[in-house]
Amino acid sequence: MMESFDFVEVKVPAKAEYIGVVRLSTSGIANRMGFSFEDIEDLKVAISEAITNAVKHAYEDSGEGEITIGFGVYEDRLEVMVADHGGSFNLGEVKEDIGPYQQDDNIEELREGGFGLFLIDALMDKVEINSKYGVIVLMTKYLHETEVGQNGDQISTTQ
């Protein structure tokens, strides 16, 4: 039986100026889940890098096309997919056909311009890539037990 999750999908034009919209969506979803401030910042940077790579490499800064961002909201993690060919995707199907990113993979074949992918890999707990139809990057960030839950009390430095 497949694990249940909520799925949120955002489509934006393949233009750098829409990265902020996705960063706000990411922040809202991750905050609701109870991620720490640091983890939310890591998520925003990693997702921004993936979108920037799609804008630059898939569409060559033409502004044509769109980028689809899918958020799989699980109890213990957030899975984020960035697809550079704009079509909707089925999270389950893509996950079956995706493989882990290996640091010795030929990055040029993945159209992911070196540094961005290494940064994404460093910030996320797991990174997988499917380059069969464009490039789909699946990034996973686990929610650690020590984080403040969505219904948790605010942390205070005063007594």
Would you name each region that the model predicts?
Residues M1-V45, G149-Q159:
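Bergerat-fold GHKL ATPase/HATPase_c domain
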Residues M1-E9, V55-Q159:
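Conserved beta-strand-loop-beta-strand hairpin that lines the nucleotide-binding pocket
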Residues F37-S62:
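Conserved ATP-binding N-box helix of the HATPase_c
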